[in-house]
């Protein structure tokens, strides 16, 4: 699966969870996003390091890799990423729709 698609889904999941009292950790797993544990760890670590999310700690120690969830939330940068990518998807669908109905295109 494309990394950026997984990143979008992770951010979207966190954004939707901001309306809930408690974060649903049960469905916030590598398996739920269709990636390996290793890829999930590194994608989350990148999102934290680049300032898209807070409330997640990614720890790599001798005994393994651990993701610690402490009330995950999007930062403004994370919200902007979601907004920009949502607009890009809409523009893509619009352009594709125009192409589909345009003869000879």
Task: Report each predicted region and the residues it spans.
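Short amphipathic alpha-helical interface segments
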Residues: 3-32
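Generic structural signal for hydrophobic core residues of well-folded globular domains
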Residues: 11-17, 47, 82-85
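Short, surface-exposed loop/turn segments at secondary-structure junctions
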Residues: 25-26, 30, 59-65
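Short, amphipathic alpha-helical interaction segments positioned at domain boundaries
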Residues: 62-97
């Amino acid at each position: 699966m494309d990394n950026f698609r997984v990143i979008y889904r992770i951010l979207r999941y966190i954004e939707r969870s901001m309306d809930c009292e408690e974060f649903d950790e049960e469905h916030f797993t590598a398996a739920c996003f269709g990636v390996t544990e290793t890829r999930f760890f590194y994608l989350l670590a990148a999102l934290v390091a680049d300032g898209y999310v807070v409330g997640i700690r990614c720890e790599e120690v001798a005994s393994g890799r651990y993701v610690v969830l402490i009330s995950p939330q999007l930062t403004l940068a994370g919200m902007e990423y979601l907004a920009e990518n949502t607009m890009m998807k809409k523009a893509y669908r619009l352009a594709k729709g125009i192409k589909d109905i345009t003869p000879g295109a």
